Design a protein with these regions (language model features):
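C-terminal regulatory/interaction regions
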Residues: 237-301
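Active-site HxH/HxHxD metal-binding segment of metal-dependent hydrolases
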Residues: 39-135
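Metallo-beta-lactamase
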Residues: 37-39, 134, 141-232
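Short acidic-hydrophobic surface loop/beta-edge motif
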Residues: 5, 23, 130-137
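Conserved beta-strand hairpin/beta-sheet module of binuclear metal-dependent hydrolase folds
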Residues: 2-52, 156-168
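Divalent metal-coordination and catalytic microenvironments
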Residues: 10, 23, 34, 49, ...
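Hydrophobic/aromatic beta-strand patches that form the interior of the parallel beta-sheet core
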Residues: 12, 31, 60, 85, ...
Length: 301
């Protein structure tokens, strides 16, 4: 049985904890949209291409998070002439993945616990920077959908009736498991949800979750929006008393009943809380003040 799960004539995917998109080109090639966490997710891509007798022409990395680019190095090293495409603001972090644990370590050299494959993939050169709203690869035109928010310059890809939405939205089962969707920019994340809700493709594939037909998209978007708003309310409620970022994060964790077992998960959670604090400050709902106890957050108007 083929590893490819067909979606439409020219699209397919390899399902898993990370869904990997495949675009089939008319010249007998293929384009991979994200490659998963590591070589163990890169290998099925290679095997599926071999089974289908197709050559990998390119990888489009939707954003720099390790669970989306970790298979890049394996595929680039083992296959010939594979070009990597990424958005301008994502490319430096794809080429230099140490930057991800650095920013999760407040800009410091990251501790060893944050230098694992969960946060730091192996880097590869990005040959093509995506700046516009469409690109052509191997004779196939792909629409680029701006989906910032989860990361600084995340993109989706639309082709042949399918929108590969990366982490622009999550499947409902993923939301219920993790509680607070990770965000770099909460306002941009909400705007990207609205942008997805307006699209008319027949199918939408999230990076994590089930393939979603157009008829079920509104419900999925609503669940994502509610999860973001729930997190925002929890952060705002945590400001009934002043506190630094870590104190606020502890309050939010308790309020949401989240169990955090590892340092990578904790670093990601604290960064998400910090994104919500920044959003509240920018909208006048929180204040950041320097005190004798350090940088302290307080509720705003």
């Amino acid at each position: 049985m083929s590893l490819f799960q067909p979606i439409t004539t020219h699209t397919a995917y390899i399902p898993g904890a990370n869904n990997l998109g495949i675009v089939l080109t008319d010249d007998g090639g293929a384009i991979a949209i994200d490659t998963g966490l590591d070589r163990d997710t890169g290998r099925p891509v290679r095997r599926a291409l071999d089974e289908a007798q197709r050559q990998l022409r390119a990888i489009i990395s939707t954003h720099h998070h390790a669970d989306h680019i970790g298979g890049n190095e394996y595929l680039v090293r083992n296959l010939s002439n594979v070009a990597v495409y990424a958005a301008r603001l994502e490319a430096p972090l794809i080429e230099h993945p140490l930057l991800e644990p650095i920013y999760l370590s407040l800009g410091a050299t990251p501790p060893s616990a944050l230098r694992t494959k969960w946060l730091m993939a192996k880097g590869v050169p990005v040959q093509h920077i995506i700046d516009g709203d469409a690109i052509e690869i191997a004779g196939t035109t792909l629409e680029i959908v701006a989906l910032p928010g989860h990361s600084i310059g995340q993109i989706g890809v639309a082709v042949d009736g399918v929108c590969f939405a990366a982490d622009g939205f999550f499947g409902p089962e993923v939301i219920s498991k993790h509680g607070i969707p990770y965000a770099h920019d909460v306002a941009a994340q909400l705007a990207s949800l609205e942008r997805l809700a307006m699209r008319k493709e027949r199918f939408f594939l999230p990076g994590h979750g089930e393939l979603t037909p157009q008829s079920e998209l509104d419900a999925a978007i609503r669940i994502n929006r509610l999860a973001i708003e729930r997190a925002m309310h929890a952060v705002r409620d945590a400001l009934t008393e002043p506190g630094d970022t870590l104190t606020v994060a502890r309050r939010v964790q308790r309020a949401l009943g989240l169990t955090i077992t590892g340092l990578p998960q904790y670093a990601i959670f604290v960064a998400a809380v910090a994104a919500h604090l920044s959003h509240l400050e920018l909208t006048g709902a929180a204040m950041l003040m320097m005190t004798d106890e350090g940088a302290i957050w307080r509720g705003g108007s």
